[in-house]
Amino acid sequence: MSQTKICALFMFNHRFERNLPMIERLYGNRFSHRHILMPFATNPGPNISRVYELGRNFSGHIAQAARDFIREDFTHYVVIPDDLLLNPDINEKNIIERLNLREGEGYINNLIAADALRYSWPWAGEAAGTFGRSAQAIDLKGLLPPAEEAKVRFENMGIVFPSSPGPANFFKRIAAQPKAARTRWAYLYTLSLLGRKSPYPLLAGYSDFLVIPAPAIDRFAHYCGVMAALNIFAEIAVPTALALSTDRLKTELELNWHFVGSAAPRADPTGLKGVAFWKEEDFRPYAELLARPLDEMIATFPEDVLYLHPVKLSNYA
């Protein structure tokens, strides 16, 4: 692969400006080109973009800030949330090699048809309904590829779309969400779709760590903006936008698996693994590591782990 030039995009979902010195401390010597995307930033500047979306719609952050960070000399853009701790051995010189990415290849944790998750993950059904409703207010012609064209593109990547989204233990899942009113509402909204397919072939994927090759960045930012305008949840908006804009896409998990749960097989069992703390049992093996002082924690970071997420960097300030 030819010489790379990386732009690291640090994504904030909230105005946590007190974390900026920690970002500099952790990554200043590892990535020469850093850009901050922060909602309502107090002091925007050449390397800090002030953006205006809710965290659940962070695809809009990318679209709003694109003109600030896109440069012709960059070969890749790496998205790193402010609460994600990237393996300290990874830097701008080795990240593409460590991820074993081919020329022009992007990276995301996983990809699955959102309709396949319609009755097991609340935001899949919500996104299907929201897309149809929001699309009535936006003329999407020329803004997104036609639905059938996008579906064929995704199927050529290996994505499998269900013939008819159907419920499985649906009401038990709703009952298991007694305190999450928005989640219960999303499930009930899903039920109102009566098994109809999404009007657009949306994908779902864990979107907190991404690599976007430069040839795709303009299209990716544009599609992210369209999805934000449609009010599509980020972990559906971003993977859909990335798969629409990138011809080759590598995933950590096998295609057609969701990121929640430990049963999903990894596409490359010998590659680096991302660790997300969804439940207490996910966090427990790393509790001692994260309780150490920052320098000691960095020195003993597991070699086979790509990142830990989420991690409160303010704990190490």
Q: Language-model segments: which ranges?
A:
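Short, well-formed alpha-helical segments that are part of the catalytic scaffolds
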Residues: 15-29
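Short loop->beta transition adjacent to catalytic acidic/histidine clusters or analogous donor-positioning motifs
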Residues: 2-7, 27-36, 48, 75
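Gly/Ser/Thr-rich loops at beta-strand to alpha-helix junctions
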Residues: 14-16, 80-86, 242
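Structural alpha-beta junctions
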Residues: 27-38, 72, 98-112, 228-229, ...
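N-proximal low-complexity "stem/linker" segments adjacent to membrane-targeting elements
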Residues: 1-18
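Active-site-proximal specificity loops/subdomain of glycosyltransferases
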Residues: 37-103, 111, 115-124
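C-terminal catalytic/acceptor-binding lobe
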Residues: 165-317
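Conserved catalytic core of nucleotide-sugar-dependent glycosyltransferases
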Residues: 85-226, 231
